[in-house]
């Protein structure tokens, strides 16, 4: 603690008294290069520290939503589709698309892999924003 007190009470005032600070703005032009560096460098460092501290203080904090109490396992996406399979894969032939197909991405659809709008209920319950995957065929 004595070292900090000595730094603030003795060494810092001595350092500031020795700085060649001009009395006017035109006096900066008359400073030698070494004197200019001795004045500008500490000013730049202190200005940067004040600016960075202000930025960090006012920087918006990330908001994490609490997990929904209705979700049993928040790490599991697929809660009911083909749970006996190691990996659920559905293939759709591109010629079968026709005008448009809407695929489920929330894993809640009763017509999986096609969307039946179940994501709307899921989004309300879980505060999520999941939507369907829409695949359109080429327009002739």
From Swiss-Prot:
<dbReference type="Pfam" id="PF10660">
    <property type="entry name" value="MitoNEET_N"/>
</dbReference>
<dbReference type="InterPro" id="IPR018967">
    <property type="entry name" value="FeS-contain_CDGSH-typ"/>
</dbReference>
<feature type="transmembrane region" description="Helical">
    <location>
        <begin position="36"/>
        <end position="59"/>
    </location>
</feature>
<keyword id="KW-0411">Iron-sulfur</keyword>
<feature type="topological domain" description="Cytoplasmic">
    <location>
        <begin position="60"/>
        <end position="140"/>
    </location>
</feature>
<dbReference type="GO" id="GO:0005741">
    <property type="term" value="C:mitochondrial outer membrane"/>
</dbReference>
<protein>
    <recommendedName>
        <fullName>CDGSH iron-sulfur domain-containing protein 2 homolog</fullName>
    </recommendedName>
</protein>
<feature type="binding site">
    <location>
        <position position="104"/>
    </location>
    <ligand>
        <name>[2Fe-2S] cluster</name>
    </ligand>
</feature>
<keyword id="KW-0479">Metal-binding</keyword>
<feature type="binding site">
    <location>
        <position position="119"/>
    </location>
    <ligand>
        <name>[2Fe-2S] cluster</name>
    </ligand>
</feature>
<dbReference type="GO" id="GO:0006879">
    <property type="term" value="P:intracellular iron ion homeostasis"/>
</dbReference>
<dbReference type="InterPro" id="IPR019610">
    <property type="entry name" value="FeS-contain_mitoNEET_N"/>
</dbReference>
<dbReference type="GO" id="GO:0046872">
    <property type="term" value="F:metal ion binding"/>
</dbReference>
<keyword id="KW-0408">Iron</keyword>
<keyword id="KW-0812">Transmembrane</keyword>
<dbReference type="GO" id="GO:0051537">
    <property type="term" value="F:2 iron, 2 sulfur cluster binding"/>
</dbReference>
<feature type="binding site">
    <location>
        <position position="115"/>
    </location>
    <ligand>
        <name>[2Fe-2S] cluster</name>
    </ligand>
</feature>
<dbReference type="GO" id="GO:0047801">
    <property type="term" value="F:L-cysteine transaminase activity"/>
</dbReference>
<keyword id="KW-0001">2Fe-2S</keyword>
<dbReference type="GO" id="GO:0010506">
    <property type="term" value="P:regulation of autophagy"/>
</dbReference>
<comment type="similarity">
    <text>Belongs to the CISD protein family. CISD2 subfamily.</text>
</comment>
<dbReference type="InterPro" id="IPR045131">
    <property type="entry name" value="CISD1/2"/>
</dbReference>
<dbReference type="InterPro" id="IPR042216">
    <property type="entry name" value="MitoNEET_CISD"/>
</dbReference>
<dbReference type="GO" id="GO:0005789">
    <property type="term" value="C:endoplasmic reticulum membrane"/>
</dbReference>
<dbReference type="Pfam" id="PF09360">
    <property type="entry name" value="zf-CDGSH"/>
</dbReference>
<keyword id="KW-1133">Transmembrane helix</keyword>
<feature type="binding site">
    <location>
        <position position="106"/>
    </location>
    <ligand>
        <name>[2Fe-2S] cluster</name>
    </ligand>
</feature>
<keyword id="KW-0256">Endoplasmic reticulum</keyword>
<feature type="topological domain" description="Lumenal">
    <location>
        <begin position="1"/>
        <end position="35"/>
    </location>
</feature>
<keyword id="KW-0472">Membrane</keyword>
């Amino acid at each position: 603690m004595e070292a900090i007190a000595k730094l603030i009470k003795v060494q810092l005032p001595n350092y500031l008294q020795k700085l060649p600070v001009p009395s006017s703005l035109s006096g900066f032009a008359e400073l030698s290069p070494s004197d200019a560096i001795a004045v500008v460098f500490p000013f730049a460092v202190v200005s940067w520290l004040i600016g960075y501290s202000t930025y960090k203080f006012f920087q918006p904090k990330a908001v994490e939503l609490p997990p929904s109490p209705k979700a049993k396992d928040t790490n599991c996406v697929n809660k009911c589709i083909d749970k006996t399979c190691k990996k659920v894969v559905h293939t759709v032939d591109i010629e079968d698309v026709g005008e448009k197909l809407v695929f489920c991405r929330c894993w809640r659809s009763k017509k999986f892999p096609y969307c039946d709008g179940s994501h709307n209920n899921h989004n309300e319950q879980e505060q999520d924003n999941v939507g369907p995957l829409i695949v359109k065929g080429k327009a002739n």
